[in-house]
Regions:
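Surface-exposed amphipathic alpha-helical segments in non-transmembrane regions
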Residues: 2-7, 22, 35-58, 69-174, ...
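A generic structural micro-feature
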Residues: 15-17, 67, 127
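Active-site acidic-Proline motif in GNAT/NAT acetyltransferases
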Residues: 29-30, 182
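Acidic helix-start/capping segments at beta-turn-to-alpha-helix junctions
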Residues: 62-65
Length: 186
């Protein structure tokens, strides 16, 4: 199905300027919640300093509480008529123009492993994380799945047609396993 879409020249549902979007931020695996928070504070400072932005709200640690290296920022922009003309723009930027700028700039902040931006006007058509296009790779062999997923991601990246390419498969997250001595605990 992916290759059939090459011939489609228009979007089924074009993005809308709703003056709101989400950024999903990731620091390196094994980062503490404190170090992730410190990096997110830098991202908040960048966003808050932008004259196009009305409000910034951040949540560190993921919504399940177990993703210490993940965060989300909810960005509310000023209404289109109230947005100033500010560098690097030569006009009042649309939400989509600003999103492209933010994606590039947030990925430059030290400590950010990945900054993806989600346009909420397109999120209602997805089954999983809310992006306009998502793929699910399934099978019984985890190693093969990881290899296939990374090969698919490499092809998507090299095409230059897609942004925010990511996987929710994270190999290498440090963990501690505790096995209680039931006899001693009794």
């Amino acid at each position: 199905g992916f290759f059939l879409l090459k011939g489609v020249k228009n979007e089924f549902v074009p993005p809308q300027d709703q003056s709101v979007f989400i950024t999903r931020l990731t620091t390196s695996l094994g980062s503490s919640i404190e170090s992730t928070d410190a990096v997110v504070l830098k991202c908040e400072a960048f966003m808050s300093a932008r004259p196009e932005v009305a409000r910034v709200y951040s949540a560190v640690g993921g919504f399940g509480g177990g993703e210490v290296n993940a965060a989300m920022m909810f960005i509310t922009m000023k209404e289109p008529k109230d947005r100033p003309v500010a560098e690097p723009f030569k006009h009042r930027p649309s939400q989509q123009e600003f999103i492209a700028f933010v994606r590039k700039e947030l990925n430059k902040i030290p400590g950010i492993e990945r900054a993806g931006v989600q346009d909420l006007s397109l999120s209602g058509f997805s089954a999983q994380r809310g992006y306009p296009v998502e793929f699910t790779v399934r099978g019984p062999d985890w190693e093969k799945l990881a290899d296939i997923a990374h090969a698919l991601m490499d092809k998507m990246k090299s095409s230059g047609l897609m942004v925010d390419i990511d996987t929710d498969y994270q190999l290498g997250m440090p963990e501690v396993q505790i096995f209680p001595n039931r006899a001693a605990a009794a």
